[in-house]
Amino acid sequence: MEPLDNTSLEESQFRPEKKEKSTCSICREDGDGYHFGAEACRACAAFFRRSVSLDKTYLCRGNNDCEITANIRCMCRSCRFAKCLEVGMNPAGVQQRRDTIGKREIKPDSTDLMQLLGSVGDGYPPTTSAQSALVEDLHPSFNDRMPILMKMRVNYRKMDNARLVIHRKDGQSLFKEKTPKAVNYKEACAQSIREVSLVADWVAWCFDDFVTLPMDQKKVLFRNFYTPFSVLEGAFLCHINDTSNALILPSGDYIDTNNLKSFFNIPDEEQPMTDDEIEKFCRMFKPSFELNRRGLVLPMMAEKIDVFEFFALCTFVFWDFGLDEQTDDCMMIGKSVKDRVMKELAFYLRCAKRLEEPSLRVASLLTLLPALQRCVRRFQEDIEITNVFNVYAPPKDFYDLVNGKFC
């Protein structure tokens, strides 16, 4: 046997190995390195860049599960773009086209209500337009895979802008910034009653399946939804505005939970109790506000719940089942809607939030629902107490509203 040549051994040890060619994670063609956060070929990288920069919206003619491989001559663009997102391509990495002309002033052609609401929203940010990543909009490229949640976001902004109009007092300018103030219980009741038609419209704008239901089933769902939604939304508004010592209302006003005496004080009216009795009354209701803070507001803050996760929770609350007078067809439709939203939520958590374990996040979200039920029951019990003893009792229409006895 011939001795091993040490020189040849050294050369073999330090000779660079032949690099394996990468594969495009979208179409399985030969890769061209990392583009926008994922291994991709030049064709898929160019397709993604063009789709994002031009705000393209694609529609799948199948079931959103088309095969995406390089040997298919005409790949489904909708599924191809969805695959780009699923493998980790980030739309934020695409440099948007520059406007070489510069910003141009756009003059309104008319002064209809929708344009008026839009301009109000620009002048005074609505409640969910706080400067927070929790309420940021997604790139339009996500529209195809999250149609319901994206529709809820667009229509929630419309509702938010409309709130700026309906909660204005007579004589107040629509274009002057409204300063939030602490309200008393009569003002809070009146604001909640004004909210009913807006929330009903929002539900109809968001869910096409709701519009097709018989009127009696619409009433069953909405009666069951309004009070839990009000409690859930109030907690979310506190969360995104980073406050836990007040209860923020959709109007932007708030209940000062550290000074409940002012909540039960009605200026220019004779008080039904002495100051000492009011103090005892406040101590009796303080635990209810604390339950809301500890059960909903603080957990939302800890989990950093964002606006799309909030919409998913709203969907689960609205399409409840086993309700009095609810039909089997209504329950089946509700299950179908919730299944679709759950798929959209899973896609959002995986592709937009980049979570490795979306199921754990979903589980954390769902733990808020039992706490919501406890807060709603406590609120209804408090309203019942004030009604029975006729002390700071709310008007009948608000009492019926809270207990689902309206419409």
Curated annotation (Swiss-Prot):
Which keywords does the record carry?
Answer: Activator, DNA-binding, Metal-binding, Nucleus, Receptor, Transcription, Transcription regulation, Zinc, Zinc-finger
Where do the NR LBD domain residues begin and end? 130-405
Zinc finger residue extent: NR C4-type: 24-44, 60-79
Q: Which Pfam families match?
A: Hormone_recep, zf-C4
Write down any Gene Ontology CC term. nucleus
Presence of keyword Zinc: yes
GO molecular function ontology, one term from the record: DNA-binding transcription factor activity
Q: In which tissues is it expressed?
A: Expressed in intestinal epithelial cells, excretory gland cells and in several head neurons.
Disrupted gene: resulting phenotype? Abolishes R24-induced expression of irg-4, irg-5 and irg-6 immune response genes. Abolishes PCN- and P.aeruginosa-induced expression of irg-4 and cyp-35C1. RNAi-mediated knockdown reduces lifespan of animals fed P.aeruginosa, but not E.coli OP50. Suppresses the induction of hsp-4 and the accumulation of active xbp-1 following exposure to R24. Abolishes PCN-mediated protection from P.aeruginosa killing. RNAi-mediated knockdown abolishes PCN- and P.aeruginosa-induced expression of irg-4 and cyp-35C1.
Look up the record and give one Gene Ontology term from the biological process aspect. Answer: regulation of transcription by RNA polymerase II
Residue ranges forming the DNA-binding region read 21-96
Where is the protein situated, by its record's location annotation?
A: Nucleus
Q: What is its main location?
A: nucleus
Q: Which InterPro entries match?
A: HNF4-like_DBD, NHR-like_dom_sf, Nucl_hrmn_rcpt_lig-bd, Znf_hrmn_rcpt, Znf_NHR/GATA
The family note in this entry says:
Belongs to the nuclear hormone receptor family.
- Annotated domain remarks: Ligand-binding domain exhibits affinity for phenazine 1-carboxamide (PCN) and xenobiotic immunostimulant R24.
The protein's job, in short, is:
Nuclear receptor which acts as a transcription activator. Binds small molecule ligands, such as phenazine 1-carboxamide (PCN), a pathogen-derived metabolite, leading to modulation of innate immune responses against virulent pathogens. On exposure to exogenous PCN, P.aeruginosa and other xenobiotic immunostimulant such as R24, activates immune response genes, including irg-4, irg-5, mul-1, drd-50, cyp-35C1 and ugt-30, probably via direct interaction with their promoters, and independent of the p38 MAPK pmk-1 pathway.
Protein name in UniProt:
Nuclear hormone receptor family member nhr-86
Q: Which organism is it from?
A: Caenorhabditis elegans
Give the lineage: Eukaryota, Metazoa, Ecdysozoa, Nematoda, Chromadorea
